[in-house]
């Protein structure tokens, strides 16, 4: 998604582009520095209505240096709540000038039903069109964009931002922060793929049944395991997932795009 935006923007502007995937821990060991000649598409997933809090300190360490910025969030077909306004504020507070923003539905980390298959071809085309429009705005209005600056207006509550509260039947709140995937020993071949994919570096590569650190429920180990050896069996988690799928599984959400001018 972000790659498509950056490539389309660069093509429209006739400039180079580079990408930085900070999903894995080793990619977050040092933060990039940007400057006034840069335009940065900054994408993050929505976690319980917010920017992922465990990776937030890294995002805050990225300095814009006057670069133009485009905050983009994905969300799993429920809502992005305060994630987009929070990301915009992080960028503004760290030297970016936000000129556009977007929120796109994407397959939920818990499920293949919630926004399954998203982003799809239509989403990717919209992302490209979004980037080209930003290029057009910058080209046609360089002084208004680069001069006096007003942050792009987006939905959401101002800081302090709100977390979404997971619930089950009878609207009972649950806490699934300590829930971790289980490993089926009859299916697991100890290939180590799950450990290599874990964004927190929490899975023991020698024994993938051991999760030493925090699990953020990104679903990578579950969805990418070639043997289907990983799953979450916690009853509250499964009930919450079922309710989400019941309420939002057949809903088709549209991307939302925002511009300063």
Give the predicted meaning of each segment.
Residues 156-191, 195-196:
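A mid-sequence, solvent-exposed acidic-amphipathic segment
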Residues 183-184, 189-216, 220-238:
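Iron-sulfur cluster-binding cysteine motifs and their immediate structural context
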Residues 45, 178-179, 208, 216, ...:
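Generic detector of bulky aromatic hydrophobic side chains
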Residues 45, 52, 119, 181, ...:
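Proline-rich low-complexity regions
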Residues 1-26, 30-173, 233-261:
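FMN-binding flavodoxin-like domain, especially the glycine-rich phosphate-binding loop
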